[in-house]
């Protein structure tokens, strides 16, 4: 069964996919940041053949933004959502964005700088879900919830679901000096966080795959790139450890062709 979507990833050569002032010179005004960020998006759009103003990203709850919605909340993209000139500024509080094939050339995606982005495509029905699955979200079983949203609410069959796990911090690079405080779900992390002589190796990909396998989903493709070590990607972890060239945000997304 052939894919109906185009998946893409941006990296350092494409520019910073964020309007956060911390990624720009201190003397930049808000208008200068917006202008440069728009130019970055338009150039990325030209590269991958979509309109750089037609990018949607979920407003996902964190420990600091005080958003409150049930875990695994999804939003199905509507005509109203895509009615604005610049979709980057459309705020959709949700963990999961879902879009149907009828909305051609509308990008659904998410920023990332080490966290895996999960794309689940129902190739038969022409509907696709995306979520940002950093380790704390994997801990609360967002990968499972992302695929389950299609199965329970849109009658997707597991055999028709094809999954892409984006570039991320691989287990060889994701290491803690102690067991991570956010890893409270032992079912998720059993054998996916391993103690190697006092160093805790975290395997996000295997934790995601386990959750997908629980739903009998086996059509899974994984990006081979480690954002921490690859020169192609920004990486928060690498930046924190002193590599200033890795300061920034990548973007992983898709659109219906």
Predicted regions and their residues:
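Active-site microenvironment for binding and transforming phosphate-containing groups
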Residues: 1-257
